[in-house]
Regions:
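N-terminal accessory alpha/beta regions
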Residues: 41-105
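Lipid deacylating catalytic domains
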Residues: 1-64, 105-180, 184-294
Length: 294
């Protein structure tokens, strides 16, 4: 396959073929908008790994019953606070009502709320994030907490990480020229490329990536960054594409952390982290085309 896509969080009940159908149409559109030919179905595949997070013995669509009391340890608290702070920053920018598709203007800043014990902080954070247009699209607060835990599990559960990376290895071939990673999938894509320098992949495209979040994600990567610099994956080009309102992609620019990354901003409206909106962007079409056609 010329192009391999790797999805992000909250795909517990979707398999690779389902995700491929969704991604392919959007990617074909992005390529056309950028003035390039479409790729065909037999040139594209997706890596599915959401089933590893699916609770066993439960009905489809079930998310574990989670609340603010289930936020565990400093890592989960800190990422939750970073999401809250970013949502509040975007809220403050939009209080003039200039952008109807921008963030809710009533989200209070964490500093306004004060600090306290983890359960208290988590409860306040979830209350404010429930106002966010982005997180509201996820549904209930238990879904947000479940997503938070998926990120931590991937980073720190070696057995789980190895299984997910094996799924990537099974999809990448000598013909693979481009890997696209969205959200947590960008972390998976990066680590898979670093672990397999023999691959013939030309271009990495990261969409809505959390790779640059210091201390929590960047510093937990494999291989470990040194002196504030991440290891360059074995690719010729790396395009990092983010919406300025994407709360998950807290660090919009990855070049300061990894070197010769081409950082690009796009506008996805209020669905700032939505993968289809990223894939249909002209910038994404151009980035993918450089790996396929040049």
């Amino acid at each position: 396959m010329k192009v391999v896509g790797i999805h992000g969080i909250l795909h517990d009940y979707l398999t690779a073929p389902q995700i491929e159908n969704e991604w392919l149409l959007a990617l074909q559109g992005g390529l056309e908008v950028a003035g390039n030919p479409r790729i065909e179905r037999n040139e594209f595949t997706c890596v599915g790994y959401g089933d590893f997070f699916r609770p066993s013995g439960t009905r489809s669509g079930y998310t574990p019953s989670l609340s603010y009391t289930d936020i565990e340890g400093e890592w989960e608290e800190e990422l939750l606070l970073k999401w809250w702070h970013e949502a509040a920053t975007l809220s403050a920018k939009n209080r003039s009502g200039e952008d109807e598709l921008g963030e809710n203007g009533t989200i209070q800043d964490p500093e306004f709320q004060g600090r306290g014990r983890i359960p208290e902080i988590a409860q306040r954070a979830l209350k404010q994030l429930s106002k966010s247009k982005y997180f509201k699209a996820w549904g209930s607060e238990k879904v947000l907490i479940f997503a938070l835990k998926q990120v931590r599990r991937y980073l720190y559960d070696k057995e789980l990480k190895d299984k997910i990376l094996q799924r990537v290895t099974e999809k990448v071939t000598q013909e693979t020229r481009v890997i696209i990673g969205h959200s947590l999938g960008s972390v998976v894509a990066y680590e898979a490329l670093c672990a397999n320098p023999q691959w013939n992949v030309h271009t990495l495209v990261t969409l809505g990536s959390p790779l640059g979040i210091q201390n929590l994600i960047f510093d937990a990567l494999t291989p470990t960054p040194e002196n504030g610099q991440g290891v360059w994956p074995n690719v010729e080009q790396w395009f990092n594409i983010a919406d300025k309102g994407d709360i998950v992609a807290l660090e919009k620019e990855l070049a300061p952390h990894f070197g010769s990354v081409t950082d690009l901003l796009v506008y996805n409206g209020w669905e700032s982290h939505d993968v289809k909106r990223y894939l249909t962007a002209k910038e994404t079409g151009c980035a993918v085309a450089t790996g396929i056609f040049e």
